[in-house]
């Protein structure tokens, strides 16, 4: 196996979608790049529901090797069973096999020139005059690698950002605890539609059913709950809301994970370092989804890193071009989602039912401001929650 070099232009820590896209774009634009992944197999363990937006906009073809289902929309299901159908917009996309998808993105990065080190752990970083010393345990051997730029794409449990003095969000009340079964013998309402359930059955979160070819991802995300996520999920399997459609379901895989849903971190760059993906809070606080966002921000991070190498300028001032780009595109939507999440978490089952009864059964796109007007018109008691949206 090829040993690590003494130095690189860019070292990316974490080979999830954000890290692989960042390393791909850095290499593509001429930077000597190393991608470090702690798992022995990229894409494992899977920790998410595997829904992604239309990936074509990121230059990725929807290859049959990882696309399991095409998604055209979703059902939002209130505690009383009222269904609201949402189609198009953010609900249009795919369910992928993350084990294959993540590896596909890493292979693409490797083909662009990135050196990849699997089963490798960064044990620390040390600031130098012109970058960082990165301490790596690579297949059991210890290395010290010099890098002009470090890209921290090491997920919700990010240590790299903290090593560099950048504050990451690890408040338990800002982490959504998730559990999921991949199951066969599940009867869906529609094989091209996702299902979302809300209320006391999943405190401050939601339950999802995502079609995945011959199987279905049945999962839950909860925040600051009294019981474990898996306990709520097991109770849901026999809930009348699913009308016996899970009675014969058989699990073939179990997954757990955490989503940072407190919004983006305040600062995502400093001298010689960039933070991206879950490590940066590049996740919708409302839905917990972040693969597409992380991929796009990864592309931005890799491009700016390569530009800084060409300019021989690795300062916070130069790297702030990355922060400016991602914030211009995503900061306001993320903060809106944070506001919507905070409202949703305060609603009782009766109030959720009132909302479902107040809005049309079919929506082409969700405009929260317009929906708030309709909700308050039919349920004035909810004004205290929605007045800031009117």
UniProtKB/Swiss-Prot annotation:
Catalytic activity: a 2,3-bis-O-phytanyl-sn-glycerol 1-phospholipid + 8 A = a 2,3-bis-O-(geranylgeranyl)-sn-glycerol 1-phospholipid + 8 AH2; 2,3-bis-O-(phytanyl)-sn-glycerol 1-phosphate + 8 A = 2,3-bis-O-(geranylgeranyl)-sn-glycerol 1-phosphate + 8 AH2; CDP-2,3-bis-O-(geranylgeranyl)-sn-glycerol + 8 AH2 = CDP-2,3-bis-O-(phytanyl)-sn-glycerol + 8 A; archaetidylserine + 8 AH2 = 2,3-bis-O-phytanyl-sn-glycero-3-phospho-L-serine + 8 A
Cofactor or coenzyme needed: FAD
Amino-acid positions noted as binding FAD in the UniProt annotation, renumbered to this chain: 18, 37, 48-49, 51, 98, 122, 278, 290-291
Keyword Ribonucleoprotein in record: no
Keyword Ribonucleoprotein: no
Entry's family note: Belongs to the geranylgeranyl reductase family. DGGGPL reductase subfamily.
SUPFAM superfamilies: FAD/NAD(P)-binding domain
Lineage: Archaea, Methanobacteriati, Methanobacteriota, Methanomada group, Methanococci
Superkingdom per UniProt: Archaea
Pathway as given in its UniProt record: Membrane lipid metabolism; glycerophospholipid metabolism
EC number in record: 1.3.-.-
Protein name per the record: Digeranylgeranylglycerophospholipid reductase
Keyword vocabulary terms for this entry: FAD, Flavoprotein, Lipid biosynthesis, Lipid metabolism, Oxidoreductase, Phospholipid biosynthesis, Phospholipid metabolism
Pfam families tied to this protein: FAD_oxidored (PF12831), GGR_cat (PF22578)
Other observations noted: Reduction reaction proceeds via syn addition of hydrogen for double bonds.
Swiss-Prot/TrEMBL GO biological process terms: glycerophospholipid biosynthetic process; membrane lipid biosynthetic process
A GO molecular function held by the record: flavin adenine dinucleotide binding
Residues annotated as signal peptide: none
Enzyme class: oxidoreductase
């Amino acid at each position: 196996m090829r040993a690590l070099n003494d130095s690189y232009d860019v070292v990316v820590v974490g080979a999830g979608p954000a890290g692989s896209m960042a390393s791909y774009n850095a290499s593509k634009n001429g930077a000597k790049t190393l991608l470090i992944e702690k798992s022995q197999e990229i894409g494992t363990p899977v920790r998410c529901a595997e829904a992604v937006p239309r990936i074509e906009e990121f230059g990725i073809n929807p290859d049959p090797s990882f696309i399991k289902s095409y998604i055209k929309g979703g059902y939002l299901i209130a505690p009383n069973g009222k269904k609201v159908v949402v189609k198009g917009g953010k609900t249009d996309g795919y369910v992928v096999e993350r084990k294959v998808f993540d590896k596909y993105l890493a292979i693409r990065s490797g083909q662009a020139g990135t050196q990849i080190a699997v089963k490798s752990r960064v044990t620390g970083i040390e600031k130098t005059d012109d970058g960082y010393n990165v301490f790596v345990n690579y297949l059991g051997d210890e290395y010290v690698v010099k890098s002009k730029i470090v890209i921290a794409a090491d997920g919700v449990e990010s240590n790299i950002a903290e090593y560099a003095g950048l504050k990451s969000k690890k408040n338990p009340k800002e982490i959504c605890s998730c559990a999921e079964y991949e199951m066969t013998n599940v009867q869906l309402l529609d094989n091209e539609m996702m299902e979302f359930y809300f209320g006391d059955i999943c405190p401050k979160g939601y339950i999802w059913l995502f079609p995945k070819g011959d199987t279905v991802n049945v999962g839950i995300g909860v925040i600051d709950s009294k019981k474990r996520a898996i306990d709520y999920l097991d109770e849901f399997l026999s809930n009348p809301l699913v009308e016996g459609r899970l009675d014969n379901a058989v699990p073939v895989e179990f997954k757990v994970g955490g989503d940072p849903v407190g919004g983006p971190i305040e600062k995502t760059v400093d001298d010689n370092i960039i933070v991206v993906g879950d490590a940066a809070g590049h996740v919708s606080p409302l839905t917990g989804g972040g693969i597409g966002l992380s991929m796009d921000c990864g592309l931005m991070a890799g491009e700016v890193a390569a530009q800084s190498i060409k300019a021989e300028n690795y300062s916070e001032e130069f790297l702030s071009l990355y922060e400016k780009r991602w914030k211009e595109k995503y900061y306001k939507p993320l903060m809106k989602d944070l506001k919507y999440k905070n409202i949703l978490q305060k609603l009782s089952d009766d109030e959720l039912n009132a909302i479902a009864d107040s809005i049309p059964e079919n929506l082409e796109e969700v405009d929260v401001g317009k929906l708030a007007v309709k909700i308050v018109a039919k349920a004035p008691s909810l004004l205290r929650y929605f007045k800031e949206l009117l």
